[in-house]
Curated annotation (Swiss-Prot):
This is Rubredoxin-2. Pfam families: Rubredoxin. Residues 2-53, 119-170 form the Rubredoxin-like domain. GO terms for cellular component: cytoplasm. GO terms for molecular function: electron transfer activity; iron ion binding. It comes from Ectopseudomonas oleovorans (Pseudomonas oleovorans). Its cofactor is Fe(3+). The gene is alkG.
Amino acid sequence: MASYKCPDCNYVYDESAGNVHEGFSPGTPWHLIPEDWCCPDCAVRDKLDFMLIESGVGEKGVTSTHTSPNLSEVSGTSLTAEAVVAPTSLEKLPSADVKGQDLYKTQPPRSDAQGGKAYLKWICITCGHIYDEALGDEAEGFTPGTRFEDIPDDWCCPDCGATKEDYVLYEEK
């Protein structure tokens, strides 16, 4: 039996052990795990991202199980081979030199102007992501000043997928 490892959190799925919590009895082979299954520890990586770390015949190696889809199989798009960017073209991109620059021209207020209540920071206990109430999170749709308690209960960590309940108050030292 083989073992497969999540490249983000190093969770290992061992076919011989299975994962009863996920509904896979011991001996469940990798090909019977649903394609939409994702890592039970970090919820970031899908099945196709896992790497084979040990095969059943005692050979050890790290091999990605990810395979790129054939462009002709991508439905509803007009992708051609010419549309795919070659990795070498990335080397020609200019780099931004931000070393020593003040990226925040003005510091965000550290307390609410109306109530005077200080803004707090919350940290994900799974990955260390910090949600700062003063800054909000524009990418997630939270404007600066959005209190953590005002974030919907079904919100998840943008970095690892952990639930809102996995955040604790962050105290700066």
